[in-house]
Amino acid sequence: MEEKENVNLVEKSNYVALENTREIDVFDEFLNAIGNENTITPVYADSSLTHLRKKSYTKVVHDCTYALVINPYDKKVIWRRGLAYLRLGHPHLANRDWEHSLELDPNNTYIQKSLHRLKEVYYIYRECAETWQLRHLRVASSQQLPVGLRKQYPNIIRGKIWWKKVHDNCQLCGQQCELKKENLSAMRSMLYMANTYAKDDTENHSPSAQIGIESSEDELENKITKGEHSLLVPEELYRSNYPCPQNIDQFLYMIKVLSAPCLYIETFSFPISTINQLFKAHGMSVEQLNLFLKSIHYIGLCSRFCKQWSDKARSLMQALSGLPWFSFVVQHCLHITAAQILLHIPDIQEEEFRNWHVSKKPINNTDLSSEFEIAEIPINCYT
């Protein structure tokens, strides 16, 4: 028995040593390639183009980064990496690469148009966010909640609500909270921490984190979705000045940001006709949609609520959870991660999640973003 155990230990040690030598050989190969850029650079450039056509954008960034280490002045590779960054939801990185590519090729009109379009769309997004930050429009009587709920929440229905900068007071009741020392940014901090953990998990499993070790994109996505902290939230959602939607356009925009944060730069909003068809297909009327808009207005992002208003928001959600269409909207329109944000009230109970048909853990669910693709940009700008 002891001899067999010794043999197994020797085999394991030999296997580990072999794997280590393979990694060392791959790294040495890459270092040697730096001195022989004429033969190796086209290999990375061709593979990046292949991955770009297959929409494997993480591998495109991986190959383009290697190619740029060898030759940092390759215009094709710089353009492709910027395009991959844009598809992955990093417009600022795409802007950086495209500006670098434009410096190398200032007469390229296509890059100029793409940069102008990118900055224009991003500016429109920021302008709308700032506009919604300042005010909420007056709600017509036909779009208000039933009389019983209006009596329960009188201060929210009446008039206009002007959003101010973050302060120590509750932004809904407009008065100083009884517990003035209460940390109103606790929930935003939790969302920020979840974002940090999710990004760290993504970086640890990224192909560029380990030289020479390839991992398929499907395996990478499975590792991320199965992780405990896999909630990637746009930065606008855990900042205190993000407004609640008050009309159909703002509602559609919020759905877009929450359901597909990596796409909201390119596809700015859903077509209203599509969302109307979706509601009609499930027997939902415009009045029900308006009721849901008002429920979002009350709930908002619960990170801005003091404890008093969090309790009232919870009771409102319990009242709305009895409606047959509410669980469908939560599950299919806002998607599971958005529902977690909207229902993330302090000291939430598991029973309440079950009543709302929402799970605490992220699950693979169908969202509206799968029906809408990014506006295509030709990938053969330099080919």
Curated annotation (Swiss-Prot):
TPR repeats lie at residues 75-108. GO terms for biological process: meiotic cell cycle; protein-containing complex assembly. It is found in: Cytoplasm; Nucleus. SUPFAM superfamilies: TPR-like. Keywords: Cytoplasm, Meiosis, Nucleus, TPR repeat. Its main location: cytoplasm. This is Meiotically up-regulated gene 93 protein. It comes from Schizosaccharomyces pombe (strain 972 / ATCC 24843) (Fission yeast).
